[in-house]
């Protein structure tokens, strides 16, 4: 069986190290290139990559997409904190190569986002999203909370209060959605127990993305197929 050759951007970070470990344990994949910041670009190694996984920074996005498009290599991007302009870059390059970007690579969160569609039946309820992360997380609310908010507002067809963001300790990630009426409270909750959940989701996304045509994809597409718009 031919292994999928993965290139990893951001391998020195916590998530990068976790992803490298997941790739090593996966019999279907192998890590062939993990360039470090400031290191000279190795075109020969880059040519061998079947799919990139990127967990770096918004500032690095343009260069990564440019290099990937030169070799027609798909990109799985789990970086968050993108500006509107940077999100447009994802769309632009997805016309040339397959690009999968999600604010959260957890398969459970993908299912949670899909489940939010059911809230359209109780759109008259009050809603609130709450998220908790470790005290080192810079963006607040988190990219995951913003995505949940966007999908929830789409489902219930109204503007909702901004997500409550709590920072403390070493929490990997807790996201709660409250739906409240005078008579009842419905709570959806997702808790990440470790970083491995995001690493496994990223590698599964990479295995899926190598078979896709150019386009902009999300982690939910790995589970449910490309949504029609």
Curated annotation (Swiss-Prot):
Main localization, broad class: cytoplasm
Specify the pathway. Answer: Amino-acid biosynthesis; L-lysine biosynthesis via DAP pathway; (S)-tetrahydrodipicolinate from L-aspartate: step 4/4
Family per UniProt? Belongs to the DapB family.
Cellular compartments per GO CC: cytosol
Classification via Pfam families: DapB_C (PF05173), DapB_N (PF01113)
What superkingdom heads the lineage? Bacteria
Gene Ontology terms, MF aspect: 4-hydroxy-tetrahydrodipicolinate reductase; NAD binding; NADP binding; oxidoreductase activity, acting on CH or CH2 groups, NAD or NADP as acceptor
Give the residues the record marks as binding NAD(+): 10-15, 78-80, 102-105
Q: Which SUPFAM superfamilies match?
A: Glyceraldehyde-3-phosphate dehydrogenase-like, C-terminal domain, NAD(P)-binding Rossmann-fold domains
The species this protein was found in: Bdellovibrio bacteriovorus (strain ATCC 15356 / DSM 50701 / NCIMB 9529 / HD100)
The answer on whether this UniProt entry bears the keyword Amino-acid biosynthesis reads yes
UniProt protein name: 4-hydroxy-tetrahydrodipicolinate reductase
Give the main EC class.
oxidoreductase
Reaction catalyzed: (S)-2,3,4,5-tetrahydrodipicolinate + NAD(+) + H2O = (2S,4S)-4-hydroxy-2,3,4,5-tetrahydrodipicolinate + NADH + H(+); (S)-2,3,4,5-tetrahydrodipicolinate + NADP(+) + H2O = (2S,4S)-4-hydroxy-2,3,4,5-tetrahydrodipicolinate + NADPH + H(+)
Q: Which terms does the UniProt entry file under GO BP?
A: diaminopimelate biosynthetic process; lysine biosynthetic process via diaminopimelate
Q: What is its EC number?
A: 1.17.1.8
Role of this protein: Catalyzes the conversion of 4-hydroxy-tetrahydrodipicolinate (HTPA) to tetrahydrodipicolinate.
Active-site residue list? 133, 137
The listed locations are: Cytoplasm
Positions of (S)-2,3,4,5-tetrahydrodipicolinate binding: 134, 143-144
Q: Keywords for this entry? A: Amino-acid biosynthesis, Cytoplasm, Diaminopimelate biosynthesis, Lysine biosynthesis, NAD, NADP, Oxidoreductase
